[in-house]
Design a protein with these regions (language model features):
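Active-/binding-site microenvironments in catalytic and ligand-binding cores
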Residues: 5-207
Length: 207
C-alpha cells in the first residue's frame, strides 16, 4: 500500500483546513457589477495542443481583499500591502444583526485578524478599538463590510487605518474559534483590490 510522505502526512493528520473562499465564477456579483467571465482562447478538444483561458473580472468579485486605494485617493494599492496582514492568528466570531460597538468586542476573543460571520455592522467606536488593539485585517461573509446604504464610512475608517478588508467569505461550516488565516491577494500593481484564495487552518485533527 502506498503511504504518504511524512511531510504530506503531517499536513493532513495534524491540521484541519477550511476553504473559506467562494468560487469566483459562481459567487453572486455585487449589485451593479458585471459577473466574471472565463473564455476559452485555445482548446485541445478543437485539435490544439493545449488549453488556455482568458479571465475578465472585477477586482471585487468572489472572495477578495480591499486595499486602501479602493476608497482613499492616495492609499496603498493591493501590491503594496504587507503580506503579514494576510497570514497569521485569526478569530472567527458569529455576530448578531445589530450595530457592533467597542464594548461588544471587549467581551469577545481578540486576534489581529478577525472574521465576522453574520449581518452585524461595525461602528466607529469598534473600528477605533480594534485598530488600537492591533487589528490588521477584518473579514466578513457579506459581499461588503459596509451596508448597501452606507458603503463609505466603514471602508474609509478601516482602510484609513491601513486595516485590510477581506470580503465575501464562505463561513457557514466554520465553527467560531481561533485559527491561522492564509489569504494573500493576487499581486496586481495599481489595483485597489484583488481576488484571493482564503483558507483557515486549525490544530484539530482532520478526520
Amino acid at each position: 500500500m502506498r503511504t504518504k510522505s511524512p511531510w504530506i502526512r503531517g499536513l493532513s493528520y495534524h491540521m484541519k483546513i477550511y476553504d473559506i473562499s467562494r468560487d469566483l465564477l459562481k459567487a453572486l456579483p455585487y449589485p451593479g457589477d458585471e459577473p466574471p467571465r472565463l473564455r476559452a482562447v485555445h482548446k485541445m478538444k478543437d485539435g490544439e495542443s493545449y488549453n488556455l483561458s482568458r479571465l475578465e473580472t472585477s477586482m471585487h468579485a468572489g472572495t477578495h481583499v480591499d486595499a486602501p486605494l479602493h476608497f482613499i485617493a492616495n492609499g496603498k494599492d493591493i501590491a503594496s500591502m504587507p503580506l503579514t496582514h494576510f497570514v497569521g492568528d485569526c478569530v472567527v466570531l458569529t455576530v448578531p444583526k445589530t450595530p457592533l460597538d467597542a464594548m461588544y468586542f471587549m467581551k469577545r476573543p481578540f486576534a489581529p485578524r478577525i472574521l465576522l460571520h453574520g449581518e452585524g455592522q461595525l461602528t466607529e467606536s469598534a473600528i477605533g478599538y480594534l485598530y488600537n488593539q492591533g487589528c490588521v485585517l477584518i473579514g466578513t461573509n457579506k459581499q461588503s463590510i459596509g451596508s448597501y446604504s452606507d458603503e463609505l464610512s466603514v471602508h474609509v475608517a478601516l482602510l484609513g487605518y491601513g486595516v485590510a478588508v477581506l470580503e465575501n467569505l464562505e463561513l457557514r461550516n466554520v465553527p467560531d474559534g481561533r485559527y491561522t488565516l492564509y489569504a494573500a491577494p493576487l499581486k496586481i500593481s495599481g489595483a485597489e483590490g484583488a481576488p484571493c484564495r482564503a483558507i483557515l487552518v486549525s490544530d484539530e485533527e482532520e478526520s
